[in-house]
Amino acid sequence: MTLRTENLTVSYGTDKVLNDVSLSLPTGKITALIGPNGCGKSTLLNCFSRLLMPQSGTVFLGDNPINMLSSRQLARRLSLLPQHHLTPEGITVQELVSYGRNPWLSLWGRLSAEDNARVNVAMNQTRINHLAVRRLTELSGGQRQRAFLAMVLAQNTPVVLLDEPTTYLDINHQVDLMRLMGELRTQGKTVVAVLHDLNQASRYCDQLVVMANGHVMAQGTPEEVMTPGLLRTVFSVEAEIHPEPVSGRPMCLMR
């Protein structure tokens, strides 16, 4: 399911955060949105999910403008792990993950056997099944992040949006998450993630979208995008590009 924008503009007061952004993201691939703080990455992701409405321009999901879809229709096609979460008081991990099935519930509002199976799969994928009966408020930041990720996975949508998903995660769980994104790709899902680690983005993602000052500066494969000149222009750093020893993907080394 293709996700694309046409002439998207978003302003906060007099500041344009996105300026006439048009792009199309590849279906069934992992795309990373990268760029310096304040460049518009999270704003773009929020426009994709309809959490934020643009001043002008359109977001399309497949052939449909997303503003023409009902909330239920959109939630069956697209899921979002936001950058910040409100942690509900008193609920367990399993209850939180079950919320991901809400778009699929019948009129009776009860979880079916398939719903429960999806919840269990999501908890296993994120390695939190042993935390199922723990309350969210008892968990560490990293454990909570994995619980919210499991809720998104339980939603089982063809498009998955992740806003800084490695926040709070130890390095082993960061690697797990990146590999999990690859598993979602093999299932035919389109994954779009805001990432700060350029080398992680290069190693694990199929496409990079580089943003700066509300504009798309470059889009393409890591080999096409990760160049010393672009890093100098966008991030104001001097870097060398070398093949990463394991994957062979471009890796930047700061001078």
From Swiss-Prot:
Enzyme Commission (EC) number: 7.2.2.18
Alphabetized UniProt keyword annotations: ATP-binding, Cell inner membrane, Cell membrane, Ion transport, Iron, Iron transport, Membrane, Nucleotide-binding, Translocase, Transport
Location(s) in or outside the cell: Cell inner membrane
Induction details: Induced 1.6-fold by hydroxyurea.
Residues in ABC transporter domain copies: 3-238
Signal peptide: none
Subunit record text: The complex is composed of two ATP-binding proteins (FecE), two transmembrane proteins (FecC and FecD) and a solute-binding protein (FecB).
Source superkingdom: Bacteria
Residues reported to bind ATP: G35, P36, N37, G38, C39, G40, K41, S42
Gene Ontology cellular component list: ATP-binding cassette (ABC) transporter complex, substrate-binding subunit-containing; membrane; plasma membrane
Membrane topology per record: Peripheral membrane protein
Protein name in UniProt: Fe(3+) dicitrate transport ATP-binding protein FecE
Function: Part of the ABC transporter complex FecBCDE involved in citrate-dependent Fe(3+) uptake. Binds ATP. Probably responsible for energy coupling to the transport system.
Catalytic activity line of the entry: iron(III) dicitrate(out) + ATP + H2O = iron(III) dicitrate(in) + ADP + phosphate + H(+)
Gene3D superfamilies xrefs: P-loop containing nucleotide triphosphate hydrolases (3.40.50.300)
GO BP: intracellular iron ion homeostasis; iron import into cell; transmembrane transport
Sample GO molecular function, one term: ATP hydrolysis activity
Membership in a protein family: Belongs to the ABC transporter superfamily.
